[in-house]
Structures are given as structure tokens and as C-alpha cells.
Amino acid sequence: MKNLQEKVKDIVEVRDFKRLTDFTVDPVKTLSNYHFTDVTAELMSKWLDRIVNLQGQRLPAFALAGYRGVGKSHFLAVLGAMMQHPDLRSRVTEPLVSTAAQRLRRRHYPVAYVRRGLKSTLREELIDALALSLELPASDLDLPLEDLLGLASDKGGEVPFILIIDTASEREAHVSRDDGAFLSEIAETAANKNVFLGIALDDDIAGADGINSAISRSYTIDYLDQEHLYKVVEAHIFPKRSQMQAVLHGVYDHLRRHLSTFRWSEQRFTALYPMHPVILEVAPIVRFYVHDFALLGFAAEAGAKILGRPADSLIGLDEVFDLVEDDLRKVNDLTEAFAAYDKLNKEVVGKLPVMQRLQAKLVLKALLLLSMDGSGKTAGEICAAMLFYDEKNTDKALKDIADTVDIFIKAMPEAIQGKADNSGELRYGFKLSNKDGLN
């Protein structure tokens, strides 16, 4: 096919993206490294207007929900940077946000960042954050919540005190506690004070059932979906060369023609190219286990490495796996899966004919990543995720993948299984101790 003679570099420009591990350390970098989309610009304008109009009104707190890695923490840190440093507001080039920022008082707003996961309770983390902002010893702040937020309100004076609650990026483990009731209590108390409260809802507190249903009553919840990331990637990480759109269409058409299970739309494929769309689907799950995995930084770094490849060679799951493997191996919930992975890699993959080894190794990597959501994947879905296809025989790749996974299952049925879904099609996956879908 003529189009596939083109290289990735002929179609796309790969731009650098500076990855930040802590958005609160350098406000200038935090702001300059943030790319607004129409969605986040509207959200930021809305949040800024709430701060402007806060005084004298009993208004609910704000919460930002969304998949891990979608940009909630960066959004909150940008808000904090603009509130804390009035000189930075003039650097905002997004018109909607710039206009909203101009309505703020041209002075410093006190800000406190509560970092969930660093102490045993949210109350302790709140006290630590307020102690830093109020410049008081934490031991002096063992007070009722009403008094704590009263001190914060007094600190603000004529402007609201900005209280931001987010999960700490440097936490050692996933936060597994129920903070819903106390978050609701903080919101109810802040509503009577000159305190603006904004929080990030991670999966451990985002449920709308049980005790955490209190959050939906106490907060105005905005949702930041992955569509935002598609737009950032397309505009700021992988801008396409306009004269090569026909070539890119040809690449997509080629994949769809030879991979019937390639289910992603052309719009989505084009936005993310040269990154496989499946990566955005596994990114939140990877981020759950590897806290410092940053999709945009990964995309920029991986993109720079594949510029010389053929146009149909996408950044794939194997590159994600290679980047995060060492960190995933440290996760207790994945210990058994990696023990099985190592055994299969050594005793099964290593003994296959040379021509089959590379594909089998790639299947093993993909299967482990794709199993982490607990649902399992069909042979067709694995083919589409890894771009396995045979131009002369479209059924051959499906059979090869199914045969390869069957070899894994026969070797270690206690670790990998194939389970029929409602349609009768087999879904394959590693058995993970904390996932019930496939298990």
C-alpha cells in the first residue's frame, strides 16, 4: 500500500511536554504547562466566578470528578496558582479564563492544599494544610471543624480562603478509606464561612451510593472526561500536518479493512495518532497502580522515538508495559500475576519456535495490562489492541492469538483463563486477586 511507505514523521509533529510530579512546587511551570480546552476553560471560568461571588452567599462546594490521570490535580493546582499569585493571571492566554480572572481582586488569596493519603485520617491532613497556610503549629489546631475553618476564613479577610483537597501524588499506596462523611462535613461548614472549597473526587470517594452519597448533596460535581485529553493530545502533543490528512485517512482505512475488531472511530484515531487509542483506555488503570504515570509525558517521549517508523506503526501497549513494569512489580495485588508472567515467559514463550516468540511475548504483555480492569479480552480485541493482522488472511491472526493464549492457559490454568461472555465468545485474562469481573 502506497500510504504505508510514509513515515510517522511525515504525518505528525511531536512536541515536548514537561512532566511535573508535584503541581504545587512551581506555580509558574504549573500554569505554563497547562493546556486549556473548551471544556476546562469553561470549568475554570465557572470556578473563578464562584470565588468572585462567594462572599455573603451560602453556596455548595465544588468537586471535580473523572478518571485517574485525566487532569484533575493539574486543574486544581492551576486554580490555586492563579489565586495565590495575582501576577500569574496575566499569563493566561485562554480568553474565557483570562476574563474571569480579571474579575478577581488584584491581591493574594490564601490557599491551603490538603493532600489525602499522607496521614491516617483526613482530619490530620486538613490540620497539616491549615497549619502551613496559617503559619501556626499543627498542635495548636486540634480544634472543632467549625473553629478550624473559622480561622481560615479570618485569614482571608476581604477575600475568600481557598481550600483545595486532592489525593497526594507522593502517597505510598492507594487511599483505601471512607472520607465521604468528613468531606461532606467540611463542605457544610465551609458554606457558612468565607471559604471556597474545591476537591478532586478519586474512585475511593466518588461513589454516589452508601455514605458517600452525602458528597452529591454537599458539592456541585463537575466531570472532566477523557474527551479533554483527546483534544490536548491532538492540539499540543501530536499536531498533524494538514497536507497529510489523506495519508492518515489511508492508514486508518488500511487498519479497519484488515482488522474488523479495530473499533475506534477515525476521529479518535486521528486525534491520538501516532498513539494507539487503547492506551487512553488502560491509562487510568495503570495510573491506579503507578501514581506518577503521566499520559501526556509518556505520549511525548514515546512519540519522539517512533518518528522513523512506518506510518502504520503506533505507540502501543508494549511501550506502556516496558515503562511501568518495574513499578507494577512492586504492587502486592499484582505479585501473583507477575510470578505467572515470568514463568510463562521463561518456560513457554522461550521454548516456542523463534518466529513465534516475539508475538507471544507481546501477547503476554498486552494480556497482563488488559486484564487489570478485571473484564478480560477476546482474541479479536487483543489483535486490535496490538495491531496483529494478516493482509492475506484476516482470520489467521485471530486464530494465532487464540492458540497462543490457549498455550498459556494449558501451561498455567491457575493463573490465566478463558471465560465465555454472554455471546459465547471467550474472554481471556490473568486472574487478579482484586478483580472480580473475570474471576
Regions found by a protein language model. Name each.
Residues 350-439:
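Terminal-proximal interaction/regulatory segments of ATP-powered molecular machines
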Residues 170, 186-211:
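Sensor-1/coupling segment of RecA-like P-loop NTPase cores
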Residues 149-151, 209-306:
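Amphipathic alpha-helical segments of the small helical/lid subdomains adjacent to P-loop NTPase cores
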Residues 148-154, 181-198, 236:
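Substrate-engagement module of ASCE P-loop NTPases
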Residues 151-179:
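Conserved P-loop NTPase "ATPase switch" module shared by AAA+ and STAND
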Residues 1-70, 216-236:
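Walker A/P-loop-proximal flanking segment of P-loop NTPase domains
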